[in-house]
UniProtKB/Swiss-Prot annotation:
Molecular function in Gene Ontology: structural molecule activity
Family listed: Belongs to the proteasome subunit S9 family.
BP GO terms, sorted: hyperosmotic response; ubiquitin-dependent protein catabolic process
SUPFAM superfamilies: TPR-like (SSF48452), Winged helix' DNA-binding domain (SSF46785)
Record key words, sorted: Proteasome
Record-level GO cellular component terms: proteasome regulatory particle; proteasome regulatory particle, lid subcomplex
Gene this chain is encoded by: psmD11
Subunit structure and binding partners: Component of the lid subcomplex of the 19S proteasome regulatory particle complex (also named PA700 complex). The 26S proteasome consists of a 20S proteasome core and two 19S regulatory subunits.
Name of the featured protein: 26S proteasome non-ATPase regulatory subunit 11
Biological function: Component of the lid subcomplex of the 26S proteasome, a multiprotein complex involved in the ATP-dependent degradation of ubiquitinated proteins. In the complex, psmD11 is required for proteasome assembly.
Record-linked Gene3D superfamilies: 1.25.40.570
Segments forming domain PCI: 217-383
């Protein structure tokens, strides 16, 4: 039996403990080929994750480091990066993963592995972004960016600038986020850009356009991103689809949401709770039902609150729905108690009072709050007097004529 057949036999073994022993045996046998050992390392890592022993991965990688001295640096780089990608699939281990990547960065510095260090640092700052450690991530990224620009490593430069754009967006610095993304897209156009990286760029472009309320352009970017992710069978395809549906809701095109979900694109996600959540939000928005909107956000809180992009736009959507409902309730009154409005809309009095104050300050509603009596006094909208405007225009025209006559008189004299 050759080495590849042995690997396949171990992979088909139902006894996990025996499989682990056999993989370790291959790693310790001097005669086993290097490529077989490389495959055994990654298979063993995946097995640990599969059986819920992901915490064993750091120990495993440390134990095989002597083997890395016997193979080329590019092969080592590939194994370590794949190993970290496997470790990334372990649930709820972000803090451990960050420390593990830091440990490997230090190992790269000690062994003078510059190429691998730069890529692991990029991975580290991406993980720090996910952990919401924005300040440290941005600080380290700026230093790395300067180093990579000197080397003119365009593929890595694109990845770094994309991460920078995400961090700046998280910090609500949209101009800098857009500048970083523009640089990433410009550099990506000068090289072969892997499909997944291009999909990430399109996704970030859509997010920034949606922040600027350009939902039509955002939708087109999300659609491009979805098609690429879908062709790669990447789970991020569902995320892109969610953002596509959100764009349709924000532009009041709720009929298109139904068409997308029940069409070719949405069929494979028919029973997905995240897509179901967005669909229900669309229905509540179409009905202008604040109560239904609240029920949906409560029922699907895990699917809607975990994503900051979705959460941000749903907050805006809720605010718009609340304004529309308040305007509809207040419309018949010239003076009404705030407590009565709160009772009709089924919200706490302080929430309603705060929202009415903002609407009045933003000049979305013409009235005042009498806090002494706890009432809203509504002013009638003053109709524009067309005769007054016409009179002003006539007087202005006469003034210009008189000025011209005065100038001519001065010339004659």
């Amino acid at each position: 039996m050759n080495w590849k057949e042995q690997l396949e036999e171990i992979g088909n073994c139902q006894d996990s403990n025996k499989a682990i022993q056999d993989y370790n045996k291959i790693l310790t046998i001097q005669e086993s080929p290097d490529d077989i050992k490389e495959e055994a390392i990654l298979r063993l890592a995946k097995l640990f994750v599969k059986i819920g022993k992901g915490d064993q991965l750091p120990t495993l990688l440390r134990s095989v480091r002597p083997f890395f001295d016997k193979i080329s640096k590019p092969k080592t780089d590939k194994i370590v990066r794949n190993f970290i990608d496997i470790f990334s699939t372990v649930p709820d281990n972000l803090t451990t993963l960050i420390e593990f990547v830091k440990e490997n960065i230090q190992w790269c510095k000690d062994t003078n592995r510059i190429y691998l260090r730069q890529r692991l640092e990029t991975k580290l700052f991406t993980l720090m972004f996910e952990a919401k450690d924005y300040a440290n991530a941005l600080s380290g990224l700026t230093t790395l960016l300067t180093e990579i620009k000197r080397l003119d490593d365009k593929p890595l430069l694109v990845e770094i600038q994309l991460v920078e754009s995400r961090i700046q967006h998280a910090l609500k610095n949209i101009p800098k986020a857009r500048a970083a993304l523009t640089s990433a897209r410009t550099n990506a156009n000068t090289i072969y850009c892997p499909p997944k990286l291009q999909a990430e760029i399109d996704m970030q472009s859509g997010i920034l356009h949606s922040e600027e309320k350009d939902y039509k352009t955002a939708f087109s970017y999300f659609f491009e991103s979805y098609e690429t992710y879908d062709s790669l069978e990447d789970p991020f395809a569902m995320k892109a689809l969610k953002y596509m549906l959100l764009c349709k809701i924000m532009t009041n095109q709720t009929d298109d949401v139904h068409a997308l979900v029940n069409g070719k694109i949405g069929l494979k996600y028919h029973n997905n709770r995240s897509i179901e959540a967005i669909t229900q939000i669309s229905k509540s928005h179409a009905k202008r039902s604040l109560h239904m909107f609240q029920e949906v956000t409560k029922e699907f809180s895990d699917q809607l609150s975990d994503d900051p992009i979705i959460h941000s736009h749903l907050t805006e959507l809720y605010s718009n729905l609340l304004e529309q409902n308040l305007c509809r309730i207040i419309e018949p009154f010239s003076r009404v108690e705030i407590s009565h409005i709160a009772k009709l809309i089924d919200l706490p009095v302080d929430v309603v009072e705060r929202k009415l104050s903002l609407m009045i300050l933003d000049k979305k509603y013409n009235g005042i709050l009498d806090q002494g009596t706890g009432t809203l006094i509504v002013f009638e909208e003053q109709k524009e007097d067309k005769l007054f405007n016409c009179s002003l225009e006539t007087i202005g025209a006469l003034s210009r004529v008189v000025d011209l006559l005065y100038e001519k008189t001065n010339k004659l004299s």
